[in-house]
A protein has these predicted regions:
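Residues within well-ordered beta-strands of beta-sheet-rich folds
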Residues: 115-117, 175-179, 283-287, 314-318, ...
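Compositionally biased low-complexity segments at domain edges in trafficked proteins
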Residues: 142-186, 255-262, 335, 353-363, ...
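Sec-type signal peptide cleavage vicinity
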Residues: 2-262, 271-282, 287, 320
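Residues that flank catalytic or metal-binding motifs in active/ligand-binding sites
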Residues: 64-66, 112, 174, 280, ...
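Short loop/turn segments at secondary-structure transitions that flank enzyme active sites
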Residues: 22, 74-76, 120-124, 184, ...
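Short, structured beta-strand segments at or near domain termini in extracellular proteins/domains
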Residues: 371, 514-529
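Acidic, Ser/Thr/Pro
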Residues: 262-312, 320, 333, 381-386, ...
């Protein structure tokens, strides 16, 4: 067995920097040989503490403590991976252009291939590049330079089995320097971003970071003519797609990435706000909440019925940067239970309570709450706070109201189906005889002015034992019902949109097909509307 202690001279290749225009990834020119390696340190050499750095200009140096992995074939024809001794200050030449690594090899086979992988952490146990290390990154220049800035040399052992005296490391990765901008590209929002996910069609990179104003550095595999998708998370969620771009190894790409808002606001029993990140047009989709079921059976089969689905309303609306939206997402109506207190709870934001059952009979499901969006703090819907004022024949929206998606009605026993929320008029509820013609769902002119849905009627001994479903929030009917139809499914509310300034308003009864509580989705549309 022969142990060799060999010092090798290794040179780094260069990462050339070139600026790109917003969202552009552009080709780079070949490196200038005069700038193959430039020294970059964070402290004086006299301190004997040398920190390797990849600078914003894309220049690389060696640092004390670094190692390379050496992969070779031994005389038994086995592949062997070893790591060099850690660099000392004396091993690094002035300027950081070269470094001497001491490597111990056992029985190397002469005139066979040898590979250097730099840094050693980028080599797996079998001596292959550990590219999976790129999948999750920290986004800082320091962490990338120390752990992920993968370079490689492939050569041949001498006829005596010695390492080549000199080697030139070739960079294997592209490095992207991302600055995250708002949709119009006029405001830097990098300081709000805590997570960036990049997909190039084949590979996925996830960058988790503490939000700060520094650019986000990402080491990436070279690709040719690839399509990229980006998602960023911070105060809000953003997305972007970029088509047909190339990343070349050994290049640094400064990229200003203008990203578009794509934010979902889920239900809370409280007012929520969103600050508009860029001036322009946005699509708002509001989903009303589902009504509760008059059943303990999740399927709502037989004599029991699930609540009606909430409505879906959408509009395209223009906002200015910094403007605040006030968002109220309706709560799902509560499911009924047995007994005198068995009516389902009213869904938050205007749903009606389900009627109680008589004695041990089951109650009606609670009505689903409405969902609405406004540019002023108009509050959530209650019995004392409606979204509209004035007469029923000509109601006036409160200042700032943009969009309402009504809630669905609560279900009732004996196959009394609930009405779906939404549409120009809310869906009918049916009674125990299957008759829905005696009264319809709420409409803009025949309703409670965007107010709370009516509570369901409780059962009694003379007419029916089961409670009725609560009405959905929104423009819910307040018409009286005949006593003979006291057990009925709750009516769905109707929806509304501000069409004087808003564009492309649409509403669909029961459009919240996934059911559950209300929500709002706000996405960037563009700087103009056709």
């Amino acid at each position: 067995m022969k142990n060799l202690y060999i010092s090798i001279l290794v040179l780094t290749a260069v990462l050339m920097a070139a600026c790109s225009s917003d969202d552009e990834i552009v080709s780079k020119q070949p490196a200038n040989n005069d700038n193959v390696v430039t020294q970059t340190t964070t402290v004086d050499f006299e301190d004997a503490v040398i920190t390797r750095a990849l600078t914003d200009a894309g220049l690389k140096t060696f640092a004390v403590g670094e190692k390379i992995a050496v992969v070779y074939t031994n005389t038994s024809n086995a592949t062997v991976k070893v790591e060099s001794a850690a660099l000392t200050a004396a091993d690094i030449t002035p300027g950081g252009k070269t470094a001497k690594f001491k490597v111990t090899m056992t029985d190397p086979k002469a005139s066979t291939s040898v590979t250097y992988i730099y840094p050693a952490a980028m080599a797996d146990a079998n001596g292959s590049p550990k590219l999976t290390a790129l999948d999750t990154q920290g986004g800082t220049l320091a962490s990338l330079a120390s752990n992920l800035d993968y370079a490689q040399f492939t050569g041949t052992l001498t006829s005596e089995g010695a390492l080549p005296e000199t080697a030139l490391l070739a960079n294997q990765l592209a490095v992207c320097k991302f600055t995250i901008m708002n949709s119009t590209g006029d405001t830097d929002i990098t300081n709000t971003i805590t997570k960036l996910t990049i997909i190039d069609g084949t590979n996925t990179y996830t960058i988790n970071r503490i939000a700060d104003a520094n650019p986000i550095f990402v080491a990436m595999r070279p690709v040719n003519n690839a399509n990229f998708s980006f998602t960023a998370t911070g105060n809000y969620n953003y997305e972007k797609t970029v088509s047909s771009k190339t990343l070349a190894a050994s290049d640094l790409y400064p990229i200003n990435l203008a990203m578009n808002l794509n934010q979902t606001i889920s239900h809370k029993e409280a007012e929520q706000t969103l600050t508009i990140p860029a001036t322009g047009w946005y699509t708002i989709q509001a989903y009303g909440a589902e009504g509760g079921a008059s059943t303990t059976n999740a399927g709502g089969t037989g004599n029991s019925k699930l609540g009606g689905k909430g409505g879906l309303s959408s509009i395209v609306y223009q906002f200015t940067q910094g403007q605040t939206l006030y968002i109220y997402c309706g709560g799902k109506g509560g499911n009924a239970s047995l007994g005198t207190n068995g009516g389902g709870a009213a869904g938050w934001n205007g749903g009606g309570k389900g009627g109680d059952g008589y004695n041990s009979s089951i109650g009606g499901g609670g009505g689903g709450g409405a969902t609405h969006v406004a540019t002023s703090q108009i509050g959530n819907i209650t019995n004392s706070n409606s979204l509209f004022t004035g007469e029923a024949s000509s109601p006036t929206a409160k200042s700032g109201l943009i969009l309402v998606a009504a809630g669905g009605g609560g279900g009732a026993y004996k196959s009394c189906a609930a009405g779906a929320g939404g549409g120009a008029s809310g869906g009918h509820g049916t009674n125990a005889q299957g008759n829905d013609s005696y009264s319809g769902g709420g409409t803009l002119s025949t309703g409670s002015h965007g107010g709370a849905g009516r509570d369901g009627t409780s059962g009694n001994a003379s007419l029916t034992y089961s409670g009725s479903g609560g009405h959905g929030g929104g423009f819910t009917t307040v018409a009286s019902l005949s006593d003979q139809y006291q057990s009925y499914g709750g009516f769905g509310g109707s929806s509304w949109g501000e069409t004087t300034n808003g564009k492309s308003y649409a509403t669909t009864a029961g459009g919240a097909t996934d059911g559950g509580p209300g929500k709002v989705i706000i996405t960037w549309y563009g700087t103009s509307h056709p």
